[in-house]
Amino acid sequence: IDNLHKAGVKDIVVVGGYKADVLKKHLERYNGITFVENSRYAETNNMYSLYLALKHTEGSGFLLMNADVYFDANIIAGLLEKDKEGNSLIACDRSGYLEESMKIATDENGKIKHISKQIAEDEYYAVSIDVYKLNADAAGILSREIYDTIEVKKSENLWTEVALDAIFSKTVFAPYEICGRWFEIDNHDDLRRAEQIFKGDVI
């Protein structure tokens, strides 16, 4: 949130599940935060959390990110600056293949054609850092895909990237190669490593 504020983003929706009351209390220190609770967090996934938040996007484009990734503020600033061209973007890191992370593959024109954890090393272009910028067109297409997945197909325990992967043939996404530090925090060991990487910052 601090990084978003530094980049000039003020209208923020946070979706929480586990210990939602603690998170909501923590967010009271900020202005302009809309909190949405996913009370079914134990049986759903992040696509369902986004589904709950979509009514707050009002048909506009938006930034989408996972809260377990910590990164430099300049990554968001760069993404928004690049967005002046009107593209939908996926922030990505080309420094190395990470087995457990989402990867992207691109077509011959450099546009993203696939996102998945299962993309092989000889086919991937970069690792996604789970930060996405959607223009209004892409946001609308993604919203319809998510509504269809959850309300019609009744598939509630899927990653958002499953829906993203399904819309690349309908709208254009380009990779945004980051310049800055980032780290995904899944456990206490990861948190300790992140504290070393971002030493001097508040995590």
Task: Give the ranges of each region predicted by the language model.
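Structural beta-sheet core signal
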Residues: V13-V14, L63-L64, I90, P175
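A general structural signal for well-ordered alpha-helical segments in protein cores
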Residues: A20, M47-L50, I76, I112, ...
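Conserved alpha/beta core of the MobA/IspD/sugar-nucleotide pyrophosphorylase nucleotidyltransferase superfamily
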Residues: Y125-I203
